[in-house]
């Protein structure tokens, strides 16, 4: 919204704005609105160095099933985006048979219950005395990420996962539980993607590691 106000006031002449803010200029003849395709993606990045996920990483597939990505695209991006199931930019060379976690709330609950989670009286799953509860951190100043995180938390609570979105000016990477990541691989995926998900790579804030 701040950029929109700056554009309207003449303080700035060019800016990248959200799809919602872009609506303020589509009928204004003094502005030209360009739709730009990007390789950006957004997703929940788990901190696998955190003890909670070391104990409960088997709940992550259920979390993926519980999130309606298309609803996020439609409501937050006003349809200006596509559903993503991985970090690589979609193109004609993609393998369309990759593992996908399409929106399926019933499947989410099934995965949890098979793994030994039981639904508590408060509507939240628990196991061994521990609630399935975690916080998704969002960097301050990005309304799109904040909105995506809020919708994800709402959808997760509908299946019995107590997720909370927290907007912060500074992120404690080592001690956080999860983060609403924003990244992209517009060119060489070996460079842009492995630095985030490769074992011991400099930008691998999640501690993710897969020998395969």
Task: Pin down the residues of each PLM region.
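Extracytoplasmic/peripheral linker and loop segments enriched in polar/acidic and small residues
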Residues: 73, 164-171, 192-212
């Amino acid at each position: 919204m701040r950029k929109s106000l700056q554009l309207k006031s003449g303080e700035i002449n060019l800016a990248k704005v959200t799809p919602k803010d872009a609506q303020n200029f589509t009928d204004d003849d003094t502005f030209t609105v360009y739709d730009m395709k990007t390789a950006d993606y957004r997703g929940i990045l788990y901190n696998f160095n955190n003890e909670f996920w070391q104990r409960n990483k088997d709940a992550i597939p259920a979390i993926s099933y519980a999130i309606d990505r298309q609803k996020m695209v439609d409501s937050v991006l006003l349809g200006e985006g596509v559903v993503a199931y991985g970090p690589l930019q979609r193109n004609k060379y993609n393998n369309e048979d990759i593992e996908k976690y399409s929106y399926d709330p019933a499947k989410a609950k099934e995965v949890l219950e098979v793994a030994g989670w039981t639904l508590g009286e408060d509507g939240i799953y628990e196991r061994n005395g521990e609630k399935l509860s975690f916080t998704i951190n969002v960097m301050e100043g990005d309304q799109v990420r904040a909105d995506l995180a809020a919708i994800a938390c709402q959808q997760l609570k509908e299946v019995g996962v107590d997720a909370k979105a927290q907007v912060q000016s500074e992120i404690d990477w080592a001690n956080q539980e999860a983060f609403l990541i924003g990244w992209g691989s517009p060119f060489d995926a070996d460079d842009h993607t492995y630095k985030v998900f490769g074992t011991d790579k400099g930008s691998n804030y999640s501690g993710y590691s897969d020998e395969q």
